[in-house]
């Protein structure tokens, strides 16, 4: 058996509410929209990981999602320009990432990061 894909499923009464955050700001493509489910993604090959955490590191809560970007400072500027409140950071962490926490429109805590 070979795992082909891992999908994060996030429950929400309004599946399109995440569009401005994930599509407009982060630039993910809408791969599927059935009204009750909207799937965001990219045609680029990405590494998939599943993390099991007791804490978020540096005294932070465990985020619902972690999204690695190529330029965390550009992502921070885009989030702030779109009016999303930054809840932590930006911070250069001792394990080699620069990151910040932001809440998406669904109230989920998202860790946006880049490796240094």
Annotate each predicted stretch with a short phrase:
Residues 1-17, 46-47, 63-65, 115-116:
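N-terminal beta-strand motif that seeds the catalytic metal site of vicinal oxygen chelate
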Residues 14-15, 65-109:
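Vicinal oxygen chelate
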Residues 14-29:
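Amphipathic alpha-helical segments
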Residues 27-33, 86-89:
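Short secondary-structure junctions
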Residues 29-62, 109-114:
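Conserved short beta-strand elements that form part of the metal-binding/catalytic scaffold
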């Amino acid at each position: 058996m070979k795992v082909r894909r891992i999908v994060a499923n996030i429950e929400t009464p309004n599946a399109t509410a995440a569009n401005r955050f994930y599509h407009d700001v982060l630039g993910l493509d809408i791969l599927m929209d059935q009204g009750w489910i909207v799937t965001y993604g990219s045609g680029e090959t990405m590494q998939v990981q599943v993390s099991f955490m007791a804490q978020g590191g540096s005294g932070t809560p465990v985020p619902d999602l972690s999204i690695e970007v190529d330029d965390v400072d550009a992502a921070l500027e885009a989030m702030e320009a779109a009016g999303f409140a930054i809840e932590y950071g930006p911070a250069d962490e001792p394990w080699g990432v620069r990151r910040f926490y932001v809440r998406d429109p669904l109230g989920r805590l998202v860790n946006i990061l880049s490796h240094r």
